[in-house]
Every structure is written in C-alpha cells, then in structure tokens.
Amino acid sequence: MTYRAAQNLIKRGDEPALRAALDTGLDPNLVNQNGWTLLMLAAVEGNLPIARLLLEKGANPALCNNKEETALTLATHRGFAQFAEILA
C-alpha cells in the first residue's frame, strides 16, 4: 500500500481498512517526501482511535518530519491536547 492510499484511509477514518493494511504488512512508520508519518496524519485529523491503532502496531511517536515536528507537536498546535496522553 502506498502512503497516499494509507493517507486516504486515515482522512476517511477507516479504522478497519487501516487495521487490515497494517496486519498485512503496511509499515506503521511509513513516511512521505516531507517526512510525515501516518501517526502525524492521524494527529492533525484529531483521530485518537487511529492514532492508538498505529501506536499498537508499532508507530514511533518520536519521529520528526522535515520541519522537526512530531505527531504530538502537530496535534497540540491544532488544539488536540488529548493526544498528549497517548503520545507523550
């Protein structure tokens, strides 16, 4: 599965399809050309269930994008303070 396809699942909030992709080999730390991880996408969408799923499957919350932002930084800047509980 490509980053773009995974991104679409996250934007749609399609947790079952994302889980199936992760179960069949999708890397939970997949990044795009800007260094954005799937966890970062979930964070900016404010989607806690998908963020929890990605963490459960091995997503690394400490990874930074090309601007040195983490998923926690991105979520906090968008007002999703509840992400601090699962990402810190």
Language-model segments: residues:
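Conserved ankyrin/ankyrin-like repeat signature
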Residues: A17, P49-I50, Q82-F83
